[in-house]
Amino acid sequence: DLHKEYRRQRQMCIRDSPNGEAQEISKHLLKKNTLIDLAADFRLKKGSDYLKWYKQKHKAVSNIKKSIYSLPEITNEQIKNYKIISCPGCYPTSILLPLIPLIKKGLIKKDNIIIDSKSGYSGAGRGVHKKYKDKNLYESLSAYGVGFHRHNSEIDQEIKKITKGKFKLIFTPHLTPMFRGILSTIYIDLENGVTQSNIIKKLSIFYKKDNFVKILKQNTLISTNDVINTNNCHISVCKSKYKNKIVTGVIAS
C-alpha cells in the first residue's frame, strides 16, 4: 500500500501529481511527515473556493489549516510551523514576487493593476497537444482562461491578505510557441511622489538575501532566455510614457 510505505519510510513527501491526490495522501502522512505539494490541493484556504475553481469537492478540508501557501522569499521562516507546504502556481509566482513587496510598502495604487502573462506550452500540461490539436501550437499565440483562469484565485487570495480586499486586478494568460518559461508584464500606477528609482530600491532591499530573485537595472529589456533552465526570476522596472505609471517585467524559467 502506497500510503503505508510513505508512513513507514518518509519524513518528507514531495508530490507532483494531479489535483486531488495530495488530499488523500495528507490524511495518512501528517503525524510524522511533512508534505510538499506542487499541485493545487492546498493553495486555496477555503474548501468552497477549491470547489468553485477546480470543480471538485476538497477531500481533506480539515488539513487546509495545517498548510501554508508558500513563496519561500515571502513566507521565509513561517514554513517551519506547517505540515503541508503548498507551492504556488507558475503565473502567481511571477506576479506575486513583485507585487507583494510594493503593496506592503504602499508604493503603488491597488485599484488598476493589469497583468499580461505569457507562458511556454509546457505549462498547459501533458494534454496540451490534444487541447490545441486544431491549431498550430508552434506558430500561434493563444489567450486562454480570460477573466477566469484558476490562478486568479491564488493571486486574489494572497493580495487580499495585505489589502483587506480593496483592490482591482485584471490577469490574462497566454500560451506561446516556446516550451517553457514565463514572462509577466504588469502595468502599475504609482502613489503620488513615488518614482521608478524608489520602486527599484525597495525591491532590491526586499530581495537582497534571496539568491534566485534578481532586480535588474532600470529600463532593462528582459527575455525568457535569460533564465531558461534555471531557478532564477528576473524583475525589471521600466518607465512608461504616462506620469506615475510603470511597467514591471518579470521572467521565470
Where do the model's predicted regions map?
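Rossmann-fold NAD(P)-binding glycine/threonine-rich loop
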Residues: 39-79
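Rossmann-fold NAD(P) dinucleotide-binding segment
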Residues: 21-37
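Single conserved hydrophobic/aromatic residue that forms the stacking wall/gate
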Residues: 1-10, 14
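Short beta-strand->loop
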Residues: 82, 86-89
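Active-site-lining helix/loop region of Rossmann-like oxidoreductase modules
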Residues: 93-219, 242-249
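N-terminal glycine-rich "phosphate-gripper" loop used for MgATP/nucleotide binding
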Residues: 15-19
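FAD-binding beta-loop-beta segment adjacent to the flavin cofactor pocket
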Residues: 220-247
